[in-house]
């Protein structure tokens, strides 16, 4: 049994992934109005990155994801750093998550009745579109001159550095098109990565990837890879998730991970976020229970979800009365 299967079994059949990172960094006073997004805090306020990991562990997360989604070597170089400094920051993202997990686990073991699992650390790798920060991560349109080979070249060194930093998992997140999924599968084979990986897509309509390509075609690519342990979706509206899980169940035997956005909608007039309940939707944790029943093995949150969200999800999925 691999580390991921073992964790899911220890969690009672469904493990909890952490939630939104940027929102929580802002809540702690970080300014992330930066092309590097939450990865900017690796440079300026690493202690806050570790604090967010701690908050999610306390909330019951079984998997915490490094703050490297938008951390790329070209992105750091554009900030005036050397290649060596950029690679050090990538390693730091995993180091901070590992330190938080180890410290939290040590404190948990001192308690007479531990109610937590020893969490796994996933090294986050965002899409090429996330690096471009031009909206293409939401459309999947990278332009005619981008090929699978170019995408492999873009991701290769970051994957090598993050994999060498000691994570338990590699998490490719919010992948918006089939070409990038194919490139990542080939890259995992070429680099002989021995760490289990997951590849999660993003969707705006609940039926296809952001690019409009079908889940079925992309899952065929992932199904053929032994390096990909988990498939799923993240950064997607929560109301689509149950249907996506049902569709994935027909197309794959791999474990399924889902960690959608909160479902809040920005009210441009009032300049505030409207809570999900205003839209007539069920609360996030109530939906999470349905996702578990539909067949998801890992459940968490993405944009605008918080430790409170994950605490509620952990309680409802694991049947706990309190943390």
Swiss-Prot record:
Keywords: Amino-acid biosynthesis, Metal-binding, Methionine biosynthesis, Methyltransferase, S-adenosyl-L-methionine, Transferase, Zinc. Zn(2+) binds at residues 235, 302-303. Its cofactor is Zn(2+). It comes from the Eukaryota. One of its GO terms (molecular function) is S-adenosylmethionine-homocysteine S-methyltransferase activity. It holds the Pfam family S-methyl_trans. Catalyzes methyl transfer from S-methylmethionine (SMM) to adenosyl-L-homocysteine (AdoMet). SMM degradation (by HMT-1, HMT-2, HMT-3 and HMT-4) and biosynthesis (by MMT1) constitute the SMM cycle in plants, which is probably required to achieve short term control of AdoMet level. PANTHER family: HOMOCYSTEINE S-METHYLTRANSFERASE 1, ZGC:172121. This is Homocysteine S-methyltransferase 1. It comes from Zea mays (Maize). The lineage of its organism: Eukaryota, Viridiplantae, Streptophyta, Embryophyta, Tracheophyta.
